Amino acid sequence: RPSHYYIDDEVVVVASERAAIQTAFNVYPEDVQELGPGNALLVRKSGHVEEVNILPPTERMSCSFERIYFSRGNDQAIYHERKDLGRLLATPVMGLLGNDLVNTVFSYVPNTAATSFYGLIDGIHEIRRDLQAEALSKIDVKNEPERVKEILSWRPRREKILVKDVKMRTFITNDSDRDDLVGHVYDITYGVVKSWNDTLVIMDDSVVRGTTLKRSILRILDRLEPKRIILVSSAPQIRYPDCYGIDMSKMGDFAAFAAAVELLK
């Protein structure tokens, strides 16, 4: 796991996240140092503090679950990383849509997916500009003003489709309670998806068991009667149990594991 520290004339503080130290002590990101691989921070009673190497550094292999779930999204490195993960999905998503922005609505779930969603939308805007330039080059701009207006109106339709009523994470709920819980977590916004016409693209920043998706979210979204639903996840696949004591010990429960099995059938 990561470890960060800050030192001044009065304190030595260590925390797993840079943003927590920044908030508590109101310091700049560059004032907070990350403990290097194989290193230890030694604080002596004399007040002398130093970072020393105690083990040979090995290849850096960050825990994806740490960065997806446990890390504060307001840390500058985590924020930009999550946004870039969303941006990487822009091209494959537009490919699935056939570059049709007019009949597509974009949204996200849960609230923590907003950062990745912004990255996705930024990436789609970049593609949109190229599509507009290409379309304009193929028409008589001076004599087709309405067509020009239509082309320039192309933009991703961003809407807040899912609303979370209660702050809860179903993946850390006991198996016996999870099924009852997932049906009461989200509600939807009506009147923004055109029935049987619009494709609905939903960005998720993490899929663990997929319980909430399968038993609640997809069923709720289906009430809006979209032509189809495309679910995209910005997070790396979670294939193995996490080591920090969360109840997720069975590999067969993971959505990524189940999907891999289905692909092999």
Regions found by a protein language model. Give the residues of each.
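PRPP/pyrophosphate-binding module of the type I phosphoribosyltransferase fold
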Residues: 177-254
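Alpha-helix boundary/interfacial micro-motifs
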Residues: 26-27, 55, 127, 216, ...
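N-terminal segments that mediate ammonia production and transfer
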Residues: 1-193, 200
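Intrinsic structural disorder
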Residues: 1, 42-43, 222-224, 228-231, ...
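Short flexible/disordered coil segments
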Residues: 49, 194, 229, 262-264
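Extended, composition-driven regions rather than compact fold-specific motifs
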Residues: 253-265
